[in-house]
């Protein structure tokens, strides 16, 4: 053991023993099983025209409990502007069929000239697919939804991703559309569908109760900024299972905001993560409870299992369990960081009952456990955590139990 720059740095390897049932650790209060694809109310055939009004009309006229089916016609691509899912109605995309967002910023603006620009706000675009106050709606594959994030916009000289990169340089915010935005909804399902090239976050489930992503594939280049995979925000009863997620930002980011509902009862089970920023909680952590991450494989993420926040957004995080996790080519396998960004604020993180069990990193990495408050250290339990012998641990204001 040695000390560097006021921090304790450890190099150690702890043996792994045994596995345990994922079902015993599931946190979603619902009984969740593999979804069943609903029957269709109508079938639309793709052609060369822009299909926004045709798809929206079919969705509006569809009976609850059924889906609008998108099938190949003279082409396999439906080109569309923003769509809204009604309550109880789903979208079904056939194998080999792609629902593709138009590459025109004006189509997504929610105020005159608000989308496709950089400013201090970053809220000028509608999502490609929106569901508000729905119950039992969903999106089903095995087809694909393509946000065209890397394609130059017809009414701009840049792509959505180039706009995001420009905003970073200018220290501003990009106005780019999310792929799927679900607000104040119950029991929303993503099943067996592929999501690619989102201009911004791929899926956001906000202020809702009941969300399932099962056999969902998300694939966007690692260089595409702010392209989170799935973000549950101020919501409860979430299951993400048997899915593959590779993005340019957090693969999954669980968030809880001030003045809104707590985020609780989250199950992340049997998933594979490729490139991205990892399995994250935060940076908004104002009430996150009862999270289970079990049977997760990660290869090539910058971070592995991460809880992040700062003085502006920290709060209570309690009851987080990571188990049966295998990582490879992950620079920082475990990160618990209360000073993720140097923002102003008076919030004190209260993080406790965080358990890592049967967690392996097969390649060299750095574990960062960084507490902000010596009087209220973070409580972490580690059992059977295995790192390579040349990995290092950085610990400050954190109580580690074995």
Swiss-Prot record:
Its main location: secreted. The active site is at residues 249, 277. It is found in: Secreted. Gene3D superfamilies: Single-stranded right-handed beta-helix, Pectin lyase-like. It catalyses: (1,4-alpha-D-galacturonosyl)n+m + H2O = (1,4-alpha-D-galacturonosyl)n + (1,4-alpha-D-galacturonosyl)m. Disulfide bonds join 41-62, 115-125. The keyword Repressor does not apply. The keyword Transmembrane does not apply. SUPFAM superfamilies: Pectin lyase-like (SSF51126). Keywords: Cell wall biogenesis/degradation, Disulfide bond, Glycosidase, Hydrolase, Secreted, Signal. GO terms for molecular function: polygalacturonase activity. Residues 1-23 form the signal peptide. One of its GO terms (cellular component) is extracellular region. Its EC number is 3.2.1.15. GO terms for biological process: carbohydrate metabolic process; cell wall organization. InterPro entries: GH28_Enzymes, Glyco_hydro_28, Pectin_lyas_fold, Pectin_lyase_fold/virulence. It comes from the Bacteria. Monomer. Involved in maceration and soft-rotting of plant tissue. Belongs to the glycosyl hydrolase 28 family. This is Endo-polygalacturonase. The gene is pehA.
């Amino acid at each position: 053991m040695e000390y560097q720059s006021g921090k304790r740095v450890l190099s150690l390897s702890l043996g792994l023993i045994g596995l345990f049932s994922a079902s015993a650790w599931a946190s979603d209060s619902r009984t969740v099983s593999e979804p069943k694809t609903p029957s269709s109310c109508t079938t639309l055939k793709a052609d060369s025209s822009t299909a926004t009004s045709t798809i929206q009309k079919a969705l509006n006229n569809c009976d609850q409990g059924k889906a609008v089916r998108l099938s190949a016609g003279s082409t396999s691509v439906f080109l569309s502007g923003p769509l809204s899912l009604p309550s109880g109605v789903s979208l079904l995309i056939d194998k080999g069929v792609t629902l593709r967002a138009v590459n025109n910023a004006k189509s997504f603006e929610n105020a005159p000239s608000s989308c496709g620009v950089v400013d201090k706000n970053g809220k000028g675009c509608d999502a490609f697919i929106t569901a508000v106050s729905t119950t039992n709606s969903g999106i089903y594959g095995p087809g694909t939804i393509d946000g065209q994030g890397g394609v130059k916009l017809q009414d701009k000289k840049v792509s959505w991703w180039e706009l995001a990169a420009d905003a970073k340089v200018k220290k501003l915010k990009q106005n780019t559309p999310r792929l799927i935005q679900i607000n104040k909804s119950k029991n929303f399902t993503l099943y067996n569908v592929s999501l690619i090239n989102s201009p911004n976050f791929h899926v956001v489930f906000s202020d809702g109760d009941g969300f399932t992503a099962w056999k969902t594939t998300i694939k966007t280049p690692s260089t595409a900024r702010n392209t989170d995979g799935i973000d549950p925000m101020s919501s409860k009863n979430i299951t993400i299972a048997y899915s593959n997620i590779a993005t340019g930002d957090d693969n999954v980011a669980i968030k809880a905001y001030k003045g809104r509902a707590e985020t609780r009862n989250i199950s992340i089970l049997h998933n594979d993560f490729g490139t991205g920023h990892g399995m994250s909680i935060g940076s908004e952590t104002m009430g996150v409870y009862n999270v289970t991450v079990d049977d997760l494989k990660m290869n090539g993420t910058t971070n592995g299992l991460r809880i992040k926040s700062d003085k502006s957004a920290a709060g209570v995080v309690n009851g987080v369990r990571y188990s049966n996790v295998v990582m490879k080519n992950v620079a920082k396998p475990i990160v618990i960081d209360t000073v993720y960004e140097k923002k102003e604020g008076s919030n004190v993180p209260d993080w406790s009952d965080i358990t890592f069990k049967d967690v392996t990193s097969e390649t060299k990495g750095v574990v960062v456990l960084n507490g902000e408050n010596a009087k209220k250290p973070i409580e972490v339990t580690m059992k059977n955590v295995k790192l390579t012998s040349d990995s290092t641990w950085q610990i400050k204001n954190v109580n580690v139990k074995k």
